[in-house]
Amino acid sequence: ILDLDTGIDDALAIAYALGSPELELIGVTCTYGNVTTELAVRNSLAVLALLGRTDIPVFAGQACASCADSFEPSPLVRRIHGDNGLGGVRIPDSPRPAEQGGAVDFIVESARRHGADLVYVPTGSSTNIAAAFEADPSLADRLRVVMMGGALTTRGNTTPWSEANVSQDPEASNALLRRGRVTMVGLDVTHQTLLTKAATARWRRLGTAAGTAFADMTDYYIDFEASEVGIAGCGLHDPLAVAVAADESLVGVLPINLRVDLAGPTRGRTIGSLEGLAESDKRTRAAVRVDAERFLAGFMDRTERVLGAR
């Protein structure tokens, strides 16, 4: 299951998952962050239709953080992903609607049905999975989670301490990290996986509608990074989490019980839990090294396979 706030790198994560023979994408649950949950549903349905996978169900999740009444994307996020979340690229709406059931029920039922075979990959806020833990507390011990979020050894990207996904709902991320069995794929490794315009040019040469659309939206993302950050590429944040779900040997992990700061200027910081440092059972692991060259080669192989077919 991918849990997405479907912006540009979420769309890339969908393509990567569909091109991965190790994975079967059984559903997409939607959250907020890059866009509203409503727009994440629309974008997920549209991207799946563009890629010819209208068989994959899409579920609406929570609309805002557990401690908030509403949500709107920040001005910075709108600059990164565009007003529509896809860099202004117009992908036709899918004719099919989201599923009637909600994201939380789908997560809980899927875990019961698939057991240890299921991996849940949240690439936005942790609000949906925290709600699922409340609905079925046994889920925390049973569900394998590979989370895109957090920053253990590097600075955050919304504040000096906090990474964007964790900052959306620090309480939910804290519940996930304190209770779940989680591999955290954070900025420590995702910032090492830069995709450049040499790669998007390869997608354009495929001569397909999907290849062109993905090249256009990713170039928008790369242009933002070049103008605002001064780097000639974009980090493949969400696709790397999907890659780790398929092949954990791509990263080196540090077993460490993590928590999230919930108050003060460091609110949203992911850090080792003081009381958990001496515990032998490390419930969480943080990715601290990545074989970026091997990941990027696999990313291009898998996405070209998917984009070239449509």
Tell where the protein language model's regions lie, with residue ranges.
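Short, mixed-charge, low-aromatic patches
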Residues: I1-L4, A60-S66, T127-A132, T196-A201, ...
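Active-site histidine-anchored catalytic micro-motif
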Residues: I1-L4, I8-A46, T54, N84, ...
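Hydrophobic aliphatic residue packing
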Residues: I8, T31, V58, L176, ...
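Conformational coupling and interaction surfaces
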Residues: A13-A17, E24-L25, S167-E171, R178, ...
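Generic recognition of cysteine residues
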Residues: C30, C64-C67, C234
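Generic "edge-of-domain/loop-turn" microfeature
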Residues: V35, A65, L152, P265-R267
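Metal-dependent C-N hydrolase catalytic cores
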Residues: V41-R113, K282-D291, F295-G298, E304
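Short, surface-exposed amphipathic charged segments that create phosphate/polyanion-binding patches used
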Residues: E72-I80, T159-E163, T200
